[in-house]
Amino acid sequence: MNKIVIALALGGLLALAPAASAQTAPQSVIHVVTVTWKPGTTPAQIQAALDGAKLLPSKYAGITRVWAKSIKVQGGKANAIAMEFTDEAALKAYTGSDAQKDWYKVYLPIRGESTTFDITN
């Protein structure tokens, strides 16, 4: 009898696992930018662009976190920046926002080439 109860309990837990996983999957969007800088760009200019990216959560409510300290970068890129948006709508609304325009003042003049990835569940 105990074996039947244990088997039923385990079966119930296994059946509920996918539903629990779906409920805890975040709806946020991770926006990853890999970048190379224009020739002649100074370390101070690069740091200003990275620092500007880190300030974005305080300037745009739809951005919750920014990571700008690259540990490993491949493919000829110099840096990577990751921004976490609350959801896809926040990412779309960021385009053309005052926060983006302000950051672009320090970022775009020194950006050589960039690649962007937007990732969500």
What are these regions (language model features)?
Residues 1-4:
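Positively charged n-region of N-terminal signal peptides that target proteins for export
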Residues 6, 16-79, 86-93, 119-121:
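Short S/T/G/P-rich N-terminal loop/turn motif that feeds into the first structured element of a domain
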Residues 81-121:
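Surface-exposed, polar helix/loop patches in the mature regions of secreted/periplasmic/lumenal proteins
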Residues 15-16, 100:
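Residues in and immediately flanking transmembrane alpha helices
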